Amino acid sequence: MTTAAHAETLGFQTEVKQLLQLMIHSLYSNREIFLRELISNAADACDKLRYEALENDTLYGDDSELRIEIEHDAEAGTVTVRDNGIGMSRDEVIQNLGTIARSGTAEFLQQLSGEKQKDAKLIGQFGVGFYSGFIVSDEITVRTRRVDQEQGVQWHSRGEGEFDIADIDKPERGTEIVLHLKEDAKEFADAERLKHLVRTYSDHIEVPVRMPKVEKAHDEEGNEIEGSETVTWETVNEATALWVRPKEEISDDEYKAFYKHVAHDFSDPLTWSHNKVEGKLEYTSLLYVPGRAPFDLYQREGVRGLKLYVQRVFIMDDAEQFLPLYLRFIKGVVDSKDLSLNVSRELLQKDPQVDKLKSALTKRSLDMLKKLAKDEEAYQTFWNAFGNVLKEGPAEDFANRDKIADLLRFSSTQTDSATQDQSLAGYVSRMKEGQQKIYYLVADGFNAASHSPHLEIFRKKGIEVLLLHDRIDEWLMSHLTEYDGKAFADVAKGDLDLDDMADEEEKKAQEETAKAKAPLIERVKTALGDEVQEVRITHRLTDSPACVVLSEHDMGYQMRRLMEAAGQPLPEVKPILELNPEHSLVARLEGADDSVFNDLARILLDQAIIAEGGHLEDPATYVQRLNKLLSH
């Protein structure tokens, strides 16, 4: 570090260096976004000044007309973007332009693969902001002065690992960014090109974006008068808040461009919902469903929420109070007439209007997803990205549990595919005559679920079973108890009750078999002792010799593993061993002498636990027993 009269050279944070290099190489084909990102930042700076000036309008001084200006110099090869917003202090410059103050940055960078197309999508999803300037320039100079400070600051870097920072005199508040364009990016030092980019990407920005317009006087014969040039400033964007305009006047392209502004995303949203509500609760909302998940989706404490405006005045980004956690992927704005202009995050937690708004916006979001679900392909894209987050809903939002249940999708024996594309409504429509319950099975993965012995009787009878193989699924089902008046039943827990679908002859045969095998059951109970809760004959198996089930209210194996991994102490749970009386191994067990019987009984128990996704406490002994039997 070198220091001289408030001038110093500092190094970029490691993550910034990595991001700069990756971005410069990965985003080359999409490099015109640099202007959108810089204008978006400038608009945010104007919004922040407008908010601070609510309590102190002297901050405007004699310059209350907020604006963004873009100039270019073709000869020098520069593009300048300036605003008269809030500006930055020296500390803010170092913080904002030298570091990435976002949790999960290191993890995000690890996801990058070196494939340009794939990385471009990921980087766009992260939000590159100011650093996008380095896609088109090899040198950037920033001059800024925070509105409440007398001293200005200059920041300068070539994007190679360090930056210079120095105090300067800057009479006007706000920020000016000068991009020194690379040789292959000189095309951007052109008025028409810049206007086109503003109108394409930033037309919806509420702050006027102005560019200089040169006009020349002409004589009576129409010839230009030399030296008569005058420069005026021309507003080149629409400069009105998109959400306050009537829906019928807004094109799909404008909606998509606005989404990219609020979400800092490169890709289009899947759908959106624009509503203006008048009456007891007055608000306008514009909500979006993104087309892909952000890298920090599963950080429940991460940054999320809507942009909050009150009477069109920007109040804050990431206002998380207006949507429940399971809808944290929804992006957009809410503009309320019922909240105070001096509202803060703390006050939002106490304002009864916020709860009403949250309830209304939650309903809007769920209705938007219900509408999206009519387009199966688009909804599948949504589900693949956000399904696991939506599954948090039934536990968090009892009032909307039925609406959320309609939106859930599962794998199923109906398709025997790992793709989660089957709805509960679809399942109910396919239920067999006499079927009273919705059957499901929880496992660690799709293959473990689809090959589970518990499915054998269901496949034989043609009864559909939902296959749940996400980590959250067992927890989900502990809060989702019924759908459309039908109770859910875990096929791996409790007694299997298919009596409603069995004829009298079948029931009678099962009862007789159970009586005939009673001595065998007693022998197995004695052999296994306290390793099992119970041993019984089952008719749920057709191909496997045995399976283990848990009591109806016991915690499943999947949930136990999650709790144990989190360090939670859990009471011991003993399984129930069920034997298939028709299987040759069970017949062999029945005829075995005591020297073989105990080993074979334990092997059947251990195999059933493994098939269920459980873990053996002593796998070495299991292998010894198996080898001993195989060598006979």
Curated annotation (Swiss-Prot):
Signal peptide start and end residues: none
Cellular component GO terms, alphabetically? cytoplasm
Which Gene3D superfamilies has this protein been placed in?
A: 3.30.230.80, 3.40.50.11260, Heat shock protein 90, C-terminal domain (1.20.120.790), Histidine kinase-like ATPase, C-terminal domain (3.30.565.10)
Q: Which UniProt keywords apply?
A: ATP-binding, Chaperone, Cytoplasm, Nucleotide-binding, Stress response
Annotated localization: Cytoplasm
Q: Which segments carry the region annotation A?
A: 1-345
Keyword Chaperone found? yes
SUPFAM superfamilies given in the database record: ATPase domain of HSP90 chaperone/DNA topoisomerase II/histidine kinase (SSF55874), HSP90 C-terminal domain (SSF110942), Ribosomal protein S5 domain 2-like (SSF54211)
Q: Where is this region: B?
A: 346-561
Location of region: C? 562-632
Matching entries from InterPro entries are given as:
HATPase_C_sf (IPR036890), Heat_shock_protein_90_CS (IPR019805), HSP90_C (IPR037196), Hsp90_fam (IPR001404), Hsp90_N (IPR020575), Ribosomal_Su5_D2-typ_SF (IPR020568)
GO molecular function annotation? ATP binding; ATP hydrolysis activity; ATP-dependent protein folding chaperone; unfolded protein binding
Task: Name the protein family.
Answer: Belongs to the heat shock protein 90 family.
Q: What does this protein do?
A: Molecular chaperone. Has ATPase activity.
Subunit structure as annotated in this protein's UniProt entry: Homodimer.
- What's the name of the protein? Chaperone protein HtpG
Q: Which organism is it from?
A: Chromohalobacter salexigens (strain ATCC BAA-138 / DSM 3043 / CIP 106854 / NCIMB 13768 / 1H11)
Q: Which lineage ranks, top first, belong to the organism behind this chain?
A: Bacteria, Pseudomonadati, Pseudomonadota, Gammaproteobacteria, Oceanospirillales
Gene symbol of the encoding locus = htpG
